[in-house]
């Protein structure tokens, strides 16, 4: 048995409902990179789906019964509840396939791991309370960001193949794996956005201007509705980290 909507000639869209974390008001989109990741994937697939925000302070009984013990994000696909984000991504890519739905997997394996350590470096930096450790942790974050910047500025094989003039230095692609958003971007961009907002708010840290590949990447992402319209408000992200971001002390 398969969940595919096109099985046996049935070309109807599947019934999909995505449940994401709600914001402070209990209704708007809250800070949750994993929720945004799935929201972006479904939007990019071009499939019809509904989104329900879940207020974790007042989780309705029907949702508790639907996915007991589970925090958003999760989704229902033709009535089946799916709760593991990585498995949901894999399932959607295997089920919502061409010709009807675009393939979103990255072509280059390196695109899937680009920026993989940024969020852990950011978390260590933002949670630190000791002034004497701040500079080293900041350097660790900057180093991870620079590694991503280097990847974004390094031409992909197909860019090298098409660059016959030899006068173009570096890559000019829009996203991790080319000029289209892929699953790799859906994973990284929500986290990168949080890093940008929170590090500035609580540590007055800006992503260095000389990281041209990284800023090109962010500029292109902010030009896409699939990203900007699935982001939580900046104030939501800042509030989510109000208790996490620690004040620095000399003790």
UniProtKB/Swiss-Prot annotation:
<dbReference type="GO" id="GO:0005739">
    <property type="term" value="C:mitochondrion"/>
</dbReference>
<feature type="domain" description="GST C-terminal">
    <location>
        <begin position="101"/>
        <end position="241"/>
    </location>
</feature>
<dbReference type="Pfam" id="PF13410">
    <property type="entry name" value="GST_C_2"/>
</dbReference>
<feature type="transmembrane region" description="Helical; Note=After insertion into the membrane">
    <location>
        <begin position="34"/>
        <end position="54"/>
    </location>
</feature>
<keyword id="KW-0560">Oxidoreductase</keyword>
<comment type="function">
    <text>In the soluble state, catalyzes glutaredoxin-like thiol disulfide exchange reactions with reduced glutathione as electron donor. Can insert into membranes and form non-selective ion channels almost equally permeable to Na(+), K(+) and Cl(-). Required for normal hearing. Necessary for the formation of stereocilia in the inner ear and normal development of the organ of Corti. Required for the proper localization of PTPRQ and RDX to the stereocilium base during postnatal maturation of hair bundles.</text>
</comment>
<keyword id="KW-0963">Cytoplasm</keyword>
<dbReference type="InterPro" id="IPR053823">
    <property type="entry name" value="CLIC_N"/>
</dbReference>
<dbReference type="GO" id="GO:0050885">
    <property type="term" value="P:neuromuscular process controlling balance"/>
</dbReference>
<dbReference type="InterPro" id="IPR036249">
    <property type="entry name" value="Thioredoxin-like_sf"/>
</dbReference>
<keyword id="KW-0868">Chloride</keyword>
<dbReference type="GO" id="GO:0007605">
    <property type="term" value="P:sensory perception of sound"/>
</dbReference>
<keyword id="KW-0407">Ion channel</keyword>
<comment type="similarity">
    <text>Belongs to the chloride channel CLIC family.</text>
</comment>
<dbReference type="GO" id="GO:0005813">
    <property type="term" value="C:centrosome"/>
</dbReference>
<dbReference type="GO" id="GO:0034707">
    <property type="term" value="C:chloride channel complex"/>
</dbReference>
<dbReference type="GO" id="GO:0015629">
    <property type="term" value="C:actin cytoskeleton"/>
</dbReference>
<dbReference type="GO" id="GO:0005886">
    <property type="term" value="C:plasma membrane"/>
</dbReference>
<dbReference type="GO" id="GO:0005794">
    <property type="term" value="C:Golgi apparatus"/>
</dbReference>
<keyword id="KW-0812">Transmembrane</keyword>
<dbReference type="GO" id="GO:0032421">
    <property type="term" value="C:stereocilium bundle"/>
</dbReference>
<dbReference type="GO" id="GO:0120044">
    <property type="term" value="C:stereocilium base"/>
</dbReference>
<dbReference type="GO" id="GO:0016491">
    <property type="term" value="F:oxidoreductase activity"/>
</dbReference>
<comment type="subunit">
    <text>Component of a multimeric complex consisting of several cytoskeletal proteins, including actin, ezrin, alpha-actinin, gelsolin, and IQGAP1. Interacts with AKAP9. Interacts with TPRN. TPRN, CLIC5 and PTPQR form concentric rings at the base of stereocilia and may form a complex. Interacts with EZR, MYO6 and RDX; the proteins may work together as a complex to stabilize linkages between the plasma membrane and subjacent actin cytoskeleton at the stereocilium base.</text>
</comment>
<feature type="short sequence motif" description="G-site">
    <location>
        <begin position="32"/>
        <end position="35"/>
    </location>
</feature>
<keyword id="KW-0869">Chloride channel</keyword>
<dbReference type="GO" id="GO:0005938">
    <property type="term" value="C:cell cortex"/>
</dbReference>
<dbReference type="GO" id="GO:0016324">
    <property type="term" value="C:apical plasma membrane"/>
</dbReference>
<keyword id="KW-1009">Hearing</keyword>
<keyword id="KW-0472">Membrane</keyword>
<keyword id="KW-0716">Sensory transduction</keyword>
<keyword id="KW-1003">Cell membrane</keyword>
<keyword id="KW-0813">Transport</keyword>
<dbReference type="InterPro" id="IPR036282">
    <property type="entry name" value="Glutathione-S-Trfase_C_sf"/>
</dbReference>
<protein>
    <recommendedName>
        <fullName>Chloride intracellular channel protein 5</fullName>
        <ecNumber>1.8.-.-</ecNumber>
    </recommendedName>
</protein>
<keyword id="KW-0333">Golgi apparatus</keyword>
<keyword id="KW-0406">Ion transport</keyword>
<dbReference type="GO" id="GO:0032420">
    <property type="term" value="C:stereocilium"/>
</dbReference>
<dbReference type="GO" id="GO:0060122">
    <property type="term" value="P:inner ear receptor cell stereocilium organization"/>
</dbReference>
<keyword id="KW-0851">Voltage-gated channel</keyword>
<dbReference type="Pfam" id="PF22441">
    <property type="entry name" value="CLIC-like_N"/>
</dbReference>
<dbReference type="GO" id="GO:0008104">
    <property type="term" value="P:protein localization"/>
</dbReference>
């Amino acid at each position: 048995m398969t969940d595919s909507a096109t099985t046996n000639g049935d070309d109807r869209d599947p019934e999909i409902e995505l449940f994401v974390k709600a914001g402070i008001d209990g209704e708007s989109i809250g800070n949750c990179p994993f929720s945004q990741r799935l929201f972006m994937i479904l939007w990019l697939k071009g499939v019809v789906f509904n989104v329900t925000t879940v207020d974790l302070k007042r989780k309705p009984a029907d949702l508790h019964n639907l996915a007991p013990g589970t925090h958003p994000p999760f989704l229902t696909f033709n009535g089946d509840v799916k709760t593991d984000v990585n498995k949901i991504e894999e399932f959607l890519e295997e089920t919502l396939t061409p010709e009807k739905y675009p393939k979103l997997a990255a072509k280059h394996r390196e695109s899937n791991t680009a920026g993989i350590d940024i969020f852990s470096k950011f978390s260590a930096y933002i949670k630190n309370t000791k002034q004497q450790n701040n500079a080293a942790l900041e350097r660790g974050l900057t180093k991870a960001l620079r590694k991503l910047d280097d990847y974004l500025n390094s031409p992909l094989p197909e860019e090298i193949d098409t660059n016959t003039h030899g006068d173009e230095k570096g890559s000019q692609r829009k996203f991790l794996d080319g000029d289209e958003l892929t699953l790799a971007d859906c994973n990284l961009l929500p986290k990168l956005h949080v890093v940008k907002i929170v590090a500035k708010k609580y540590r007055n840290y800006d992503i260095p201007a000389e990281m041209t590949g990284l800023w090109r990447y962010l500029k292109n992402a902010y030009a896409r509705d699939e990203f900007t319209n699935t982001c939580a408000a900046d104030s939501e992200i800042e509030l989510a980290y109000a208790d996490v971001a620690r004040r620095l002390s000399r003790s």
